[in-house]
Amino acid sequence: MPIEAVRTAKVVLVGCVGVFGVLTGIDNILDYRTNFEVVHHVLSMDALAPNGAFAWRAITDPRLQRLAYAAIIATELLYGILCILGALRLAGGGRGPGVRSFDAAKGLSVAGLALGFALYFFGFLIVGGEWFQMWQAGQWNMQEAAFRFLGAIGLV
C-alpha cells in the first residue's frame, strides 16, 4: 500500500475523532440537561441500594456535579480541537519527504487521541463505572457508549 494512502487515512481518522469530540462537547452544552442528568445520577449513586457498600462514595453536591460535567465537556472540546489541529498539521506539515516529516507532525494528534482515550477509559469506565458503580445504575449506565467511543479512538 502506498505510504500516501496510509498517511491520508491517518489524517482522515484523526480528523473524524476531532469532529466527534468537538460535536459531543457542543451538543453537551446546547442540550445541557440531558447528559447532566446522567452525571447527576451516576455521581449521586441514587440508582443503587441506599445502604450499599460504596454509598459513601456518592457526590450529592450539585456544584461538584456541575463541575464534573464541565470537566467532561472541556475535555471533549479539548481532545476534539487537538485532533482537528493535529489532522491539519499532518495534512500540511506531514507531507514533506520521508517518514520523519510526518512523524514530527504527529504531536497534537497523539495528544488529542490520548486525551480522548483517557476521558472514556479513566473517566467513564474506571471512575464512573467502578468508583461510582455506574454498571449497576440501570438506565444511567453509560459504559456501553463509553466503550464504543473508547474503541473507536483506540483503533485510530
Regions found by a protein language model. Give the residues of each.
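Short, Lys/Arg-rich, polar N-terminal cytosolic tail immediately upstream
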Residues: M1-A5
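N-terminal signal-anchor transmembrane alpha helix
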Residues: V6-V38
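Hydrophobic alpha-helical transmembrane segments of polytopic
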Residues: K10-C16, I72, S109-L119
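Membrane-interface interhelical connector segments
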Residues: R33-L64
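Individual transmembrane alpha-helix segments
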Residues: A58-Y79
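Cytoplasmic juxtamembrane regions at transmembrane-helix boundaries
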Residues: I81-V110
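Alpha-helical transmembrane segments of multi-pass integral membrane proteins
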Residues: A114-V156
